[in-house]
Amino acid sequence: MRPQLVAAFEAHGHLLTRRQALAAGATMAEIDHWVRVGAWVSVRRGVYALREFWDGLDEWRGQPMYAARAASAAMVRPHVMSHDSAALEHGLEVLMPKQSLVHVTRPGVLGSRLERGVKHHKAPYRPEQVVTVNGRRVLDMARTVADISRDRGLDAGLVTADSALRAGVTRTQLAEAVARMRNWAGVTVARDVVDLADPGAENAAETLGRRLVTDLGHGRPDTQFGVTDGRRRIWCDLRLGRHMFEIDGWLKYRPTDRGGLSSDPERTLREEKQRQDFISGFKLGVSRIVWADFWGEARLRALEREYLDTCRRWGTSIDDLTPFLIPARRLAG
């Protein structure tokens, strides 16, 4: 492949429209050839990426984001990126569906509609809600949280809302975005999201874990609960009474040569066991939650049993732990 074509991809953010490729010196025959042999990926009709670049993108964030950029590049009518597509541009966490869609909001569109993997939304927006991110016009973070909440429900809304609060958006800004949506479809879910959002959840798994623990019906758990014995400091993901809920991601136990984060899995397991023993030493119960637990009724019942067992053994008050508590971290929101 000619160097000027590779340079053209880099100059245009790793995506080339057919017109841009022709302007860079490619011929129609060359474009068809590179697509046919697999060196170029047709991300969208008339929009291409180099195979090596595309395959290096992860399927949950990178590829959906560039698919949205490609769809935007192929559109001739005015639009702004919105919903999941806007969240990805902002760097917010998104609970991606199995089949991701490109989302745009267009002025004057009569009714939302799905067309070749692009969902066109009709909801009006104010000029000040449009910001430029990575050279693209997108709806701002607060509006994006509200849109995802209305369109995709409480879990997806909370994941993005928690992420937005961590990024510096205030709860007041979220509330203002939702307040402008009076009588819109799904607005009650968006209001619930504003109320329940918590920047203490450090990732999507902790957000969903908080939702799971809340569903036990014993109140909202505290996030990022810290204890120390004067030498060691431990932060627990969630606390309800005297019971801690720790969110486990399997990547931290998986060897690095299998795509994980641990260079020594046995040591990682040993350190995690020592960590749990340290927590239990304060007469605190501990439950562990993994991703698969978020949608299982059986696991919800098991967590209920574990929580109630802690209550029977040690009660719910943590007044005796006052000398050992670490002041709460300063968090946005």
Predicted feature descriptions by range:
Residues 1-186, 222, 308-333:
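Short gly/ser-rich loop at a beta-strand->alpha-helix junction or flexible surface loop bordering the NTP-binding
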Residues 3, 7, 11-12, 27, ...:
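Surface segments flanking catalytic/ligand-binding clefts of nucleic-acid enzymes
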